[in-house]
């Protein structure tokens, strides 16, 4: 079959529209990242994965940053992997005393013994509300931080590490390897958990739903999300101005993208860092249309 140049171009454009036409290029990502670094006097790491092509682009993508509460999405992903193996069910319950509660526990504080919580409720609290006690309960169920790190390694992630419980893991001391990841490593692990085959379909859908139900992320990537797009995310915050987010973003057309942004070593306010993440997101989203 002979195709004219015009017809061939039309086919190329059709193919491009079937997937994402493009993701942000390295030069543009570097420019926007450096602009925000200068504004915040911060260190910023970004990773974007185009799941249609498998290609990734990053800025400081292999540098370590504090995990902070972004670990909660991965933590519950690891818990779901145990559910998939039949070790327990999300409907199973746990009880805990008032002494178990730590700072920022808006959900678990309402379920102190003799009340109980299901593991479904625990992970909903940890991801959708960033409840710190819920995260500690999930980590304890998995055998503690080191066992959680081993589960990450089982997913092929030998970079991301959990060393402590909430709230100590948020110390974010510059140069400390404890409780850190890299933008690229965490993005790849998130992709495996939410879009890959690391979890069974039902568990994968549950993790995504918890992230879509995030109640504390409106000022970050969601602030610049185009109309008709969808997002599931998990934010984090810690000492030394640390602010972060990992996300799965579904454009109106095409395949999802993974977007992770980490900010640290700054005296900027939380609102300023939120705005920086929203601006970074806007540039990424505009390039993905």
Regions found by a protein language model. Give the residues of each.
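Bacterial N-terminal signal peptides that target proteins for export
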Residues: 1-8
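Structured C-terminal helix/loop/strand segments within mature extracytoplasmic catalytic/sensor domains
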Residues: 22-39, 52, 140-141, 145, ...
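Active-site SXXK
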Residues: 54, 66-94, 259
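Acidic helix-start/capping segments at beta-turn-to-alpha-helix junctions
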Residues: 51, 90-107, 142-143, 169, ...
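Mid-domain, small-residue-enriched loop/turn segments at the edges of structured enzyme/sensor domains
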Residues: 43, 115, 136-190, 194-195
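Short, conserved catalytic-motif segment at the N-terminal edge
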Residues: 37-65, 88
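Short, well-structured active-site flanking segments
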Residues: 81-100, 145, 149-150, 200-204
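Conserved catalytic neighborhood of penicillin-recognizing serine enzymes
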Residues: 101-136, 145, 179
């Amino acid at each position: 079959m002979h195709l004219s140049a015009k017809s061939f171009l039309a086919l190329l454009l059709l193919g491009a529209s079937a997937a994402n036409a493009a993701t942000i290029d390295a030069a543009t990502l570097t420019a926007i990242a450096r602009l925000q670094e200068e504004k915040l006097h911060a260190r910023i790491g970004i990773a974007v994965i185009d799941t249609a092509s498998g290609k990734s682009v990053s800025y400081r993508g292999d540098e370590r940053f504090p995990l902070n509460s972004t670990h909660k999405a991965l933590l519950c992903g690891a818990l779901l992997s145990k559910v998939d193996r039949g070790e327990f069910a999300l409907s199973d319950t746990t009880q805990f005393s008032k002494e178990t509660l730590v700072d920022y526990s808006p959900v678990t504080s309402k379920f102190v013994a003799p009340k109980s919580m299901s593991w479904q409720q625990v992970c909903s609290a940890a991801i959708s509300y960033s409840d710190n006690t819920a995260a500690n309960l999930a980590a304890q169920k998995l055998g503690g931080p080191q066992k959680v790190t081993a589960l990450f390694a089982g997913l092929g992630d030998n970079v991301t590490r959990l060393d402590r419980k909430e709230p100590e893991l948020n110390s974010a001391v510059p140069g400390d390897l404890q409780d850190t990841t890299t933008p690229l490593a965490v993005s790849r692990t998130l992709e495996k958990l939410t879009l890959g085959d690391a979890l069974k379909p039902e568990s994968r859908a549950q993790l995504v739903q918890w992230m879509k139900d995030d109640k504390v992320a409106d000022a970050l990537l969601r602030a610049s999300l185009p109309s008709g797009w969808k997002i599931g995310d998990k934010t984090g915050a810690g000492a030394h101005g640390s602010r972060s987010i990992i996300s799965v973003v579904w454009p109106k057309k095409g395949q999802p993208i993974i977007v992770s942004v980490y900010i640290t070593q700054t005296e900027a306010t939380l609102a300023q860092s939120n705005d920086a993440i929203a601006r970074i997101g806007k540039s990424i989203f505009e390039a993905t249309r």
